[in-house]
Amino acid sequence: MRPLNAAELLKSRSQDHKLAKPQFLSKKKRLELQRAKEDEEREKTELKRKTNTLKRSSPSEPETILDQKDTSTANKKRKKRFNFEWDDEEDTSSQLEPMMAYPTSNNDFLPAEEHWSDKKLEDMTSRDWRIFKEDFSITCKGNNIPNPLRSWKESGIPTTLLNTIDQLGYKEPTPIQRAAIPTALGHRDVVGIAETGSGKTLAFLIPLLSYLSAIDKDYMEVEHKQESNLNKVLGLVLAPTRELALQISKEAKKFASVLGYNVVTIIGGHQYEETVKSVQDGAHIVVATPGRLIDSAEKGLIDLSQCYHLTMDEADRMIDMGFEKALQSILSFLPSTSSSGFGLDSTIFKVKSRITLMFTATISPPIEKITKDYLQTPAYLYIGDAGEIVDNINQKFEYLGDNVDSQEELNAPRTNKMISALRQHIRETEQPLIIIFANFKRTCELLSVELSNQNVGSNIVIHGSKSQEARESAIASFREHKVNVLIATDVAARGIDIPNVSLVVNYHMPKRFDEYIHRIGRTGRAGKSGASLSFVDDGDSEILVNLKSFLSKGTKRLPDWLLRHPAVQSLTLKD
């Protein structure tokens, strides 16, 4: 290559020097330069278009146009621009020649699809409803199940009841309420599968209250107030434990006092005279445990012959507690699923068959049998899954190996570790509420004494040997933060609704794994985070495989001791 001439180098340097100095340009000069640049761009575009046209008209002579170009000019242009690895002929983007002209748009992108929360109810598409259900972890099984609630105002609930909901401060429905209420309002049987603390109580109380409001006014104001009809139950709610029944009654009375209905609570530990007195104001809603309800029905204290609205809350727990036969007996007292479709009752109560709502945390064979025998084509509504429980609760374990505990005396290593953890939790937590579960009543009493001696919080004990009055008083004291440690057997594991429990301690692991879920379900409720501490020994081998499977549904690492335990490596998961 021949070196550049010295004169050319000096000339180029002089021009570069001039360009390096900033120069003032008038507005007129700037406009002239801009127009010249635009003219040059238009010429380039026109030349390119003609070139492409000729290429398409003479496919056998692709080099013709290039041969006509000035070679030196082409070389100069190539020096000024970046060279790609492909030739210009291979640039397919330059060959676009639209058949018609399209109007220009200021936005090259389609507008984002409107979110379901910004749409009117009538504009919701099937895709919107799928997204809605995913957002609230709702799964439905069955035919012709209505869409969930988006808000209270779109629910179709009677206005007086809707106003009461607003007055009591219920701002937004929970997922189980969104799914169950529209279905139950349509007089469809429901099986709701959801954990405790998900808002199930309101999910069945609102349909029940709506049902009562639709009953013939003359019947409610005249006939039902006759002495012979006062004990006729209009709506029945069954619960497995006294504590849960009291909790449901408390919630129901908030609405009933405003709407003019009477709530009767029938549970063990209360005198029959109390039941007789309660029904004098009408048995609009009865909340009961199975055993005491059967006794009251057999004694003629209540009449279930016109009860067309039945709710079974925590049905799985009732089965676990041996109430399966009691449930079947109660169902025999009620009208059959089709009897109200005939005669005067269908006109008075505005239903064609009995409405049955069942809520459970699990679906077991006994639950399936009751569903098949006593419910009519129910809608199955699943809320969330076990993975949510795993991630909402920070579950910690202390593995003690063969250091198995007894009920005669406290296990020193276990007790000392627990006391240390309790002190740290109380120190780090604002307004702590702690529930300690033990398998033996004697252990509960011994733990109470030990915690008092060690000045660890203030505690109270609840178990099956305590009177009903003592148990209710203990739960009230704990709920009101008069004490911050509740020591209990499994009698308190399900049903009681105590918000903001910060820690659950399993001093003993339960013998059944589903009880472990129910225990730790006292914390981390309604989407809040919680914590649990469980002491595990080799006597708990029967539930370790299930524990591993349960923890695997979460996102946290499994404990090493659990992965290495012989029971996990040798046993198969039990259904």
UniProtKB/Swiss-Prot annotation:
One annotated Gene Ontology cellular component of this protein: nucleus
Residues that hold ATP according to the record = A194, E195, T196, G197, S198, G199, K200, T201
Identify the residue span(s) of motif DEAD box.
Answer: 313-316
The kind of enzyme this is, by top-level EC class, is hydrolase
The short motif Q motif is annotated over 150-178
Which segments constitute the Helicase C-terminal domain? 421-566
Signal peptide boundaries:
none
The EC number(s) attached to this protein equal: 3.6.4.13
Gene Ontology BP terms: mRNA processing; RNA splicing
Pfam families found in the cross-reference section = DEAD (PF00270), Helicase_C (PF00271)
Family, per entry: Belongs to the DEAD box helicase family. DDX23/PRP28 subfamily.
**Domain comment text?**
The Q motif is unique to and characteristic of the DEAD box family of RNA helicases and controls ATP binding and hydrolysis.
- The protein's assembly and partners: Component of the U5 snRNP complex.
Q: What is this protein called?
A: Pre-mRNA-splicing ATP-dependent RNA helicase PRP28
Organism per entry: Meyerozyma guilliermondii (strain ATCC 6260 / CBS 566 / DSM 6381 / JCM 1539 / NBRC 10279 / NRRL Y-324) (Yeast)
